[in-house]
Amino acid sequence: MLTIALSKGRILDDTLPLLAEAGIVPTENPDKSRKLIIPTTQADVRLLIVRATDVPTYVEHGAADLGVAGKDVLMEYTGQGLYEPLDLQIAKCRLMTAGAIGAVEPKGRLRVATKFVNVAKRYYAEQGRQVDIIKLYGSMELAPLIGLADKIIDVVDTGNTLRANGLEPQELIATISSRLVVNKASMKMQHARIQALIDTLRKAVESRHRC
């Protein structure tokens, strides 16, 4: 049995057509189903529906053989038990700093609100900047508006939400897309099966970008 971990939302919507190229189609609509384990048209393949931030954990610990996760999630994740063989080039966005429009950056310690704590620590350490990191799980845009933080680090798509809240995107930390991740032990035990799937997905990605 091959288990693939996916998260609902944009990544799931963009991944399903790629899996269909490999003949893997869920037997019911994951967006409408309450089931968290969904069979597919291939009897030996099932989908596991989990939170986006949990995909690497399920894959590393062998609860899933493969998964699809945003590069932002993988950058934040600290585990080591994953291969990242393929950029699926879907769910593209940017990981950026943002602050109040026209605000002057303080010269002393910078207060940064984000759910990407590990990314933030690395980013500012590379700059040699002293920062206080405030972990938030949502509504990042509030932090600079009410004086909780000077800046935020978050995923930015169009930037409309930032601008609607009086913020502007600033430094680009990374360009984000979703990646296929594979459990290291699964890659050894089911190498032929998984490699065939990787090859099929790679061809599907390349075909889309030739069009």
From Swiss-Prot:
What is one process in the GO biological process aspect for this record?
L-histidine biosynthetic process
Which keywords belong to this entry? Answer: Amino-acid biosynthesis, ATP-binding, Cytoplasm, Glycosyltransferase, Histidine biosynthesis, Nucleotide-binding, Transferase
Gene Ontology molecular functions: ATP binding; ATP phosphoribosyltransferase activity
Pathway the protein acts in: Amino-acid biosynthesis; L-histidine biosynthesis; L-histidine from 5-phospho-alpha-D-ribose 1-diphosphate: step 1/9
Q: Where in the cell is it found?
A: Cytoplasm
List GO terms (cellular component aspect): cytoplasm
The EC number(s) attached to this protein equal 2.4.2.17
Q: Which reaction does it catalyse?
A: 1-(5-phospho-beta-D-ribosyl)-ATP + diphosphate = 5-phospho-alpha-D-ribose 1-diphosphate + ATP
Q: Subunit structure of this entry? A: Heteromultimer composed of HisG and HisZ subunits.
Record text about domains? Lacks the C-terminal regulatory region which is replaced by HisZ.
Q: Which family does it belong to?
A: Belongs to the ATP phosphoribosyltransferase family. Short subfamily.
HAMAP family from the entry?
HisG_Short
**Cited function:** Catalyzes the condensation of ATP and 5-phosphoribose 1-diphosphate to form N'-(5'-phosphoribosyl)-ATP (PR-ATP). Has a crucial role in the pathway because the rate of histidine biosynthesis seems to be controlled primarily by regulation of HisG enzymatic activity.
Q: Which NCBIfam families does its entry note?
A: hisG (TIGR00070)
Protein name (Swiss-Prot/TrEMBL): ATP phosphoribosyltransferase
Q: Which organism is it from?
A: Pseudomonas syringae pv. tomato (strain ATCC BAA-871 / DC3000)
